């Protein structure tokens, strides 16, 4: 039977949230905690995690969520890898759904699912029917907690210019990762079933307050559609934001265009 490995990527004190949510041990599930520590005094892991034989904790000093995910993937040993945040909650039923989908799609290198908020509502407007990533409805996108990776597949690394903790682009790493994988020939299949509950907010909620999120939107559009296509989409996006002030829209457009140029000329 395939082994599931939940890859928790956490920073400093966020590790404390994991212990409260772990289900009882299960022979086909293991947990890898990639724990970034930013320096200063040495931090101790919660005793509840240290007592679990199914939990491995690896400490490193890098900065940035994408770097942490790459670190976790490089050290993973399971067959099916779940990308997890500290606030994610898993139950046996979710693992069973994942295993069933993986068995139904042995050709898929990446499996996509749904996430639910703690009160039961879906975290976003997901496609209603199963589909491949290439055939997904327009406007559909997926977050890290929706993604399960087959370790044996040819997978890209996360682009470390994107994501929380990155210098300029504060999100978008999942969209770039999935697009790179798809272009590289990896088959990606979506199953409309919930496999995780979370209390976390999406980075899209910070669009108007965080310039790094706005820059990332421009950069992601540039990767997907090229500089010209991205610029036209940014102009349209800024024009239709009727609830935002003129100043907010100008600032958003500036940051998105900045992101386009950054992606085009950086590496």
Map each language-model feature to its residues.
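Short aromatic/hydrophobic "clamp" motif used to bind/position activated sugar donors
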Residues: 81
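Conserved donor NDP-sugar-binding/catalytic core segment of glycosyltransferases
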Residues: 93-126
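Acidic donor-binding segment of Leloir-type glycosyltransferases
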Residues: 18-59
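Acidic donor-binding loop at a coil-to-helix junction in glycosyltransferase catalytic cores
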Residues: 164-179
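Non-catalytic, C-terminal membrane-associated alpha-helical segments of glycosyltransferases
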Residues: 208-267
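Catalytic beta-strand/loop signature of glycosyltransferases that borders the donor
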Residues: 185-197, 210
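Glycine-rich, basic loop-to-helix element that forms the pyrophosphate-binding segment
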Residues: 60-76
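A recurrent flexible, glycine/aromatic-enriched loop bordering the glycosyltransferase active site
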Residues: 119, 131-150, 162, 168-169
């Amino acid at each position: 039977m395939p082994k599931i490995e939940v890859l928790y990527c956490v920073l400093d004190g966020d590790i404390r949230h994991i212990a409260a949510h772990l289900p009882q041990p299960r022979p086909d599930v293991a947990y890898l905690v990639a724990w970034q520590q930013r320096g200063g005094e040495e931090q101790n892991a919660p005793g509840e995690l240290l007592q679990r034989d199914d939990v491995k904790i690896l400490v490193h000093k890098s900065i940035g969520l994408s770097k942490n995910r790459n670190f976790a993937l490089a050290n993973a040993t399971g067959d099916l890898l779940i990308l997890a945040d500290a606030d994610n909650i898993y139950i046996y039923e979710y693992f069973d759904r994942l295993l069933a989908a993986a068995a139904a799609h042995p050709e898929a290198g990446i499996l996509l699912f749904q996430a639910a908020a703690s009160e039961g509502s879906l975290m976003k407007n997901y496609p209603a029917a199963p589909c491949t990533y290439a055939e997904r409805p327009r406007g559909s996108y997926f977050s890290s907690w929706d993604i399960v990776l087959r370790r044996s597949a040819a997978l890209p690394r996360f682009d470390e210019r994107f994501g929380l903790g990155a210098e300029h682009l504060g999100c978008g790493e999942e969209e770039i990762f999935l697009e790179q994988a798809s272009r590289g020939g990896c088959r990606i299949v979506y199953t409309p079933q919930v496999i995780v509950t979370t209390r976390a907010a999406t980075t899209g909620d910070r669009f108007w307050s965080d310039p790094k999120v706005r820059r990332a939107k421009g950069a992601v559009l540039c990767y997907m559609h090229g500089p010209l296509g991205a610029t036209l989409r940014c102009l349209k996006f800024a024009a239709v934001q009727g609830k935002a002030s003129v100043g907010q829209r100008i600032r958003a457009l500036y940051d998105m265009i900045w992101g386009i140029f950054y992606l085009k000329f950086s590496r």
